[in-house]
């Protein structure tokens, strides 16, 4: 382990806290107001960064399975009314669509950062899709 520099400190003797004098009147202090404690608040952005790290570490699906399955069936119903799906097929569709969306949001975030912003906007997503040659 690397050696670190130690700074000189003034040596201070430990002192016990003084007891209050008994001659003071005990009733002069204001009574405590309700005892309501404020809830702890993190600095803005701390929880967002924690959430980002949590989801980047995990490999779980981000969208719930049943709502995604209903969406797939609704879209398929518009194309052909008598389509049936294996559960593995819907799982593969969900994996692929989530990977696509995550990558799109990463590119969108890069576009926002390039514009010296931290908030993504629709025009960032349009630029990301245009650079990918996906659409207008």
From Swiss-Prot:
The modified positions for Asymmetric dimethylarginine read 3, 18
Sites where N6,N6-dimethyllysine occurs are at 5, 10, 28, 37
Q: Which residues carry this modification: N6-(beta-hydroxybutyryl)lysine?
A: 5, 10, 19, 24, 28, 57
Locate the coiled-coil region(s) and give their ranges.
Answer: none
Q: Which residues carry this modification: Phosphoserine?
A: 58, 87
UniProt modified residues of type Allysine: 5
Q: How is it modified after translation?
A: Acetylation is generally linked to gene activation. Acetylation on Lys-10 (H3K9ac) impairs methylation at Arg-9 (H3R8me2s). Acetylation on Lys-19 (H3K18ac) and Lys-24 (H3K24ac) favors methylation at Arg-18 (H3R17me).
Its main localization is nucleus
What positions are modified (N6-lactoyllysine)?
10, 19, 24, 28, 57
**In this chain, where does the modification 5-glutamyl dopamine occur?**
6
Q: Which GO cellular component terms, listed alphabetically, does the Swiss-Prot or TrEMBL entry include?
A: nucleoplasm; nucleosome; nucleus
Q: Which Pfam family is one of this chain's hits?
A: Histone
Tell me what the record says results from residue 63 to I: Does not affect stability of the nucleosome. Triggers interaction with DAXX
- On this chain, the residues bearing N6-methyllysine are 5, 10, 19, 24, 28, 37-38, 57, 65
Q: Where N6-glutaryllysine occurs along the chain? A: 19, 24, 28, 57
Q: Which CDD domains match?
A: HFD_H3 (cd22911)
Give expression by tissue. Answer: Expressed at low level in some tissues, such as testis and brain.
Q: What is the effect of changing residue 43 to R?
A: Enhanced binding of histone H1 to histone H3.Y-containing nucleosomes. Does not greatly affect the stability of the nucleosome
How the protein assembles, per its UniProt entry? The nucleosome is a histone octamer containing two molecules each of H2A, H2B, H3 and H4 assembled in one H3-H4 heterotetramer and two H2A-H2B heterodimers. The octamer wraps approximately 147 bp of DNA. Interacts with HIRA, a chaperone required for its incorporation into nucleosomes. Does not interact with DAXX chaperone.
Its protein name is: Histone H3.Y
Organism for this UniProt entry: Homo sapiens
Its taxonomic path starts at:
Eukaryota, Metazoa, Chordata, Craniata, Vertebrata
